[in-house]
């Protein structure tokens, strides 16, 4: 079952990407992914890690980095789900990954595997999306496609959300004042409902 889940996820496609990642950066990715699975952190901030990769001279796109993060998160959560030993885990990867990467996986699984497996028994290990940060600011439209929008205030909202794999993404959108007031009203309604629970 463990093998089938890994195959269904498409691990074969990510192996080549992982081969170009230096062991120290791979270890950092593993650590952040495990902390996310243990709910010690909201997620893995892909943009910050991507900057580390660029500074280290690793030529990889942000999209490819996201695939690697998903690979790591799925590897450890699936291994925890099936409570595999370190040797079982490595036996499935030994022909596909470099020795240094396997050493990192061995170290992380020996340190955290038991705890992840225990957490898996008590709850679903893959958390749902989580709001990490909420920022807003008021602005004034100084250029517009329609003259009616000129010199009208608007609210810019930035949401940082961690998805199930721990990747943090930013979503930015603008609302007119009436749209923001409606948004505010709906959030207040949610808050009052939560107070009754």
From Swiss-Prot:
Residues 130-197 form the COMM domain. GO terms for cellular component: cytoplasm; nucleus. Keywords: Cytoplasm, Nucleus, Transcription, Transcription regulation, Ubl conjugation pathway. InterPro entries: COMM, COMMD4/6/7/8. Its main location: nucleus. It is found in: Nucleus; Cytoplasm. PROSITE patterns: COMM (PS51269). Scaffold protein in the commander complex that is essential for endosomal recycling of transmembrane cargos; the commander complex is composed of the CCC subcomplex and the retriever subcomplex. May modulate activity of cullin-RING E3 ubiquitin ligase (CRL) complexes. Down-regulates activation of NF-kappa-B. Inhibits TNF-induced NFKB1 activation. Component of the commander complex consisting of the CCC subcomplex and the retriever subcomplex. Component of the CCC subcomplex. PANTHER family: COMM DOMAIN-CONTAINING PROTEIN 4-8 FAMILY MEMBER, COMM DOMAIN-CONTAINING PROTEIN 6. Belongs to the COMM domain-containing protein 6 family. This is COMM domain-containing protein 6. It comes from Xenopus tropicalis. The gene is commd6.
């Amino acid at each position: 079952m463990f093998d089938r889940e890994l195959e269904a996820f498409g691990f074969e496609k990510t192996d080549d990407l992982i081969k170009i990642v230096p062991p120290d950066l791979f270890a950092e990715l593993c650590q952040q992914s495990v902390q996310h699975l243990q709910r010690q952190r909201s997620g893995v901030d892909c943009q910050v890690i991507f900057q580390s990769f660029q500074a280290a001279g690793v030529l990889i796109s942000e999209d490819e980095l996201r695939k690697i993060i998903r690979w790591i998160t799925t590897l450890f959560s699936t291994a925890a789900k099936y409570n595999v030993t370190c040797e079982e885990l490595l036996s499935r990867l030994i022909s596909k990954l470099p020795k240094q990467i396997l050493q990192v996986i061995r170290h992380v699984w020996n340190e955290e595997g038991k705890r992840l497996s225990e957490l898996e028994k008590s709850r679903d290990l893959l958390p749902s999306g989580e709001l990490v940060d909420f920022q807003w600011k008021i602005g004034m439209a100084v250029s517009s496609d329609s003259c009616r929008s000129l010199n009208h205030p608007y609210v810019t909202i930035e949401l940082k959300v961690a998805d199930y794999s721990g990747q943090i993404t930013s979503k930015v959108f603008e609302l007119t004042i009436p749209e923001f007031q409606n948004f505010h009203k709906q959030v207040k309604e949610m808050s009052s409902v939560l107070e009754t629970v």
